[in-house]
Amino acid sequence: MKSSSSQSYDVFPNFRGEDVRHSLVSHLRKELDRKFINTFNDNRIERSRKITPELLLAIENSRISLVVFSKNYASSTWCLDELVKIQECYEKLDQMVIPIFYKVDPSHVRKQTGEFGMVFGETCKGRTENEKRKWMRALAEVAHLAGEDLRNWRSEAEMLENIAKDVSNKLFPPSNNFSDFVGIEAHIEALISMLRFDSKKARMIGICGPSETGKTTIGRALYSRLKSDFHHRAFVAYKRKIRSDYDQKLYWEEQFLSEILCQKDIKIEECGAVEQRLKHTKVLIVLDDVDDIELLKTLVGRIRWFGSESKIVVITQKRELLKAHNIAHVYEVGFPSEELAHQMFCRYAFGKNSPPHGFNELADEAAKIAGNRPKALKYVGSSFRRLDKEQWVKMLSEFRSNGNKLKISYDELDGKGQDYVACLTNGSNSQVKAEWIHLALGVSILLNIRSDGTTILKHLSYNRSMAQQAKIWWYENLERVCKKYNICGIDSSTDGGGSTYGQCSNSQFQRNMDASPGGNKTSNQSTKDSPRASQVEKEKIEYCEPHVYITPAIFSDGTRAPKYVESSSRRVTQVHHAKTWWPENCEKVYENHNNIYGIDRSIDGGDKFEGKSKVSDGGLDGKDQGSMYGQSSNSELQINMDADNRRCEPVSEMLFKNYNVCSPNGLTDVNCSNPQSQRKLDASLKKDKIVHEWIRTGSGFFFDFQGPKSIVSAAQVDEKNFEYCEQGVYITLGILSGGIIVLKHLEFSRRMAQQAKVWWSENWIKVYQEHNICGIDKSFDGRFDDRRVIRQLRPN
């Protein structure tokens, strides 16, 4: 017959069938099955006088052997031969063996005395001395191992439950992935005490604390520690996906019941199934990152929904949510102390709680860079792992830079927090004080208060749907925030690109956002006091050190002019009574003010303009105009954004609309967020004679563009056009013939870069077809080392 032992087993049971098959062993199998332990079953094996190779293989392929010694165990040569094999695997293969003494004295088994010895003596009659020696040795050694004696338990059921738990812990020990989280044992012990395992009553508790204190890590470690005690268990991190409240609740219940009952695709017709199905069931439930009271009401509405001894843990940042759900027992998680933070850093950096000799000062400085936030400690500590002293010094120098500090801060954010990034850097001569304002709907805004008292507020959103929620909040609350914090500018861009980039969603309150060092202007001031756009001095439009952010604004009289949202503390540009941003009619601005030469639409405001610092009527001063920095991502608004309109031929409006061309004067304006790389890119494009001729004449296939046939093949795209950009900024460039298309994408963390990769893997063909993009970089930090990725993504 075909062997059933071709697979591995968790447990091999060795027992005398006549004594315990339909009693103890049957109940033991049930307990093991409840814990998803794969147990060998010999029911289909034909018994014979000699043990079969099939059984020998099953013993070898099992991780644990359970030997049940009963009154008539020794009457079976089959059992004794299996025991010899088990003892051999214990010695040679380090297999785990657990003896169970069922209504028999362990000393009688070890010494083959008493009633057990009498039965064994009968079995040995007619056997060779070699067989008897093997059996006696196996009985003595296995019976000496730590096991369970029924006489020590109040009931058989309690003993079997404990055996199943012990086996589960040996097979699936709690994860040690949390060992680097110094102090986690204290958290777990406190939570176990709060859950009251000494009580038969079901209990629900909460874990609460600020973001990035390790609440989820603590919750997962607790779940890992307790899960072996619960057949029905679930670690839940659901979020709202469906607009309809009722449909969303049905979806949550179906997912929850499928997971906790281990049944695929459970379907329910109406809400309330959780209470109906689990009210007599002992469960372990951990709800992570809860921010929706409806989730609690749907899945754990009442403690009476669950059976006795059930344990439910709710993890959230919102204490008011726990209060609203009447969760009285709350465990507060704070940031680790300086001592614990230092130990945590050392665990990640050195694999132990303290630094080795010669690294004390270096470790102290590195730990201070990370602060007391667990994720930052993990990121920084892991960065120094296995580095020598010289490499430590070099790495510390890198971490002192603003870029790495920003990256650490960003990596500290949780999944939702990383959808909203708020960052700003002022001039090095300014004393900056930063504080987080936690706004409605989970939006985080960073206020930078300069030494002169004025405030810059920057809001960056990468999720368009969440940005819409942010807009609603700003519409209702912006005036109050601006007045309270003396805000002089705001950027409400959504995702670093698209037609809405740079538009303010709070036009009603924009007039209150033009704070000057002298104070804020009010919205009630007459428009007659407002300067006309023509009165704006040209010298206001100039390079003002790094971190300058220019944006166009519409005055109260309808005229328009550029406006600095941010400038250095030494040059504060004053433009009063801007009411809204320019969502339409931008051509009028450039017709009236041809000194406007571009807009910085970068994410962090850290790009500086190339070329000379001032703008004249004839364009940029000097011969080397450099790159047209800050090109618009909205093709329709970019048509007239050239410094020298008189020398630029009219551009086909169709091409701008359909292909999002970055500037009207052609291919030299491919824009990169790194000035040094931009110059290289411009220079390489200018060397192309065909491109140069096209720029000079303003004619050719550019204006006669009919379709993909006019585009150079992907193979002709010079890979040197894919430039490296600093500080971990994620850039994707798709360059057509000479550079017509520029696709720019900014990412600040590997997690978000991975998300971008997933999106591109699913949609890049469609994007290529629509925009004729010839190449794209999928790397995390803009280092285009993997040319295979670029080649792979080129269209056929």
Swiss-Prot record:
Residues of the TIR domain: 7-171
Gene Ontology CC terms: cytosol
Biased composition (Basic and acidic residues): 607-624
GO biological process: defense response to fungus; regulation of defense response by callose deposition; signal transduction
UniProt keyword annotations, A-Z: ATP-binding, Hydrolase, NAD, Nucleotide-binding, Plant defense, Repeat
Ribonucleoprotein in keyword set: no
EC number: 3.2.2.6
Catalysed reactions, as listed in the record: NAD(+) + H2O = ADP-D-ribose + nicotinamide + H(+)
All residue ranges annotated as the NB-ARC domain in the record: 185-413
Active site: 82
Compositional bias annotation for Polar residues: 502-528
Region (Disordered): 502-537, 607-636
Function: TIR-NB-LRR receptor-like protein that confers resistance to the pathogens Leptosphaeria maculans (blackleg disease), Botrytis cinerea, Alternaria brassicicola and Alternaria brassicae. Required for efficient callose deposition downstream of RLM1 during infection with L.maculans.
Protein name as annotated: Disease resistance protein RLM3
